[in-house]
Amino acid sequence: MVSVFSSLRQSFKGLLVLVPVLIGLAFISPAEAVQWDAETLTVPVNPDGAEVTFTDREINAGRKVFNTSCGTCHAGGITKTNQNVGLDPETLALATPARDNVDALVDYMKDPTSYDGEYSISDVHPSMRSAELYPAMRDLDDEDLRLMAGYILVSPKVQGSSWGGGKIYF
């Protein structure tokens, strides 16, 4: 009987040590634990081939603004209202005009056009032009848009094909 209680007491002591460690690990997200290299953080800034290297802090700030302003419809780089048009690199590159660089994405967030570039969709897609309809866009400035564009372009390098890949990856 004594050995049973002794054994239980030892197990309980082990749990007391393990629980704080597990709780601490629960609050460390992969984004906070990883330091990305310059190649991962470097993306095209314009169609001419110029590049910009974002910092970890800028990408995390862009992620926060993106999740707050765009994440409801574009979580994971998908487009909930149109599964055929996501935020993956191939889809962005094939748009007209191509939206695979920071300047083009910022321009799109200011005044979005259809995928073929033929007409404005600012009346149905959140943008700076339609900020009165979409409150999440009201307080954004050019720097916020630049940071979101950086996050969108860096995400596929970090998340691979799951960024913009749709529900098969969730």
Curated annotation (Swiss-Prot):
Tell me the superkingdom of the source. Answer: Bacteria
Q: How does it sit in the membrane?
A: Peripheral membrane protein
The record lists its disulfide bonds as none
Q: Does the keyword Electron transport apply?
A: yes
Kindly give the PROSITE patterns that the UniProt entry links to this protein.
CYTC
Signal peptide residues on this chain, from the entry's feature table: 1-33
> Could you tell me the Gene Ontology terms of the biological process aspect for this record?
photosynthesis, light reaction; respiratory electron transport chain
Is Kinase tagged as a keyword? no
Cellular component (GO) terms are: photosystem II; plasma membrane-derived thylakoid membrane
Give the Pfam families listed for this entry.
Cytochrom_C550
As for family, the record states: Belongs to the cytochrome c family. PsbV subfamily.
Job of this protein: One of the extrinsic, lumenal subunits of photosystem II (PSII). PSII is a light-driven water plastoquinone oxidoreductase, using light energy to abstract electrons from H(2)O, generating a proton gradient subsequently used for ATP formation. The extrinsic proteins stabilize the structure of photosystem II oxygen-evolving complex (OEC), the ion environment of oxygen evolution and protect the OEC against heat-induced inactivation. Low-potential cytochrome c that plays a role in the OEC of PSII.
NCBIfam families reported in the protein's UniProt record? PS_II_C550 (TIGR03045)
- Protein name, UniProt field: Photosystem II extrinsic protein V
Organism in which the protein naturally occurs: Synechococcus sp. (strain CC9902)
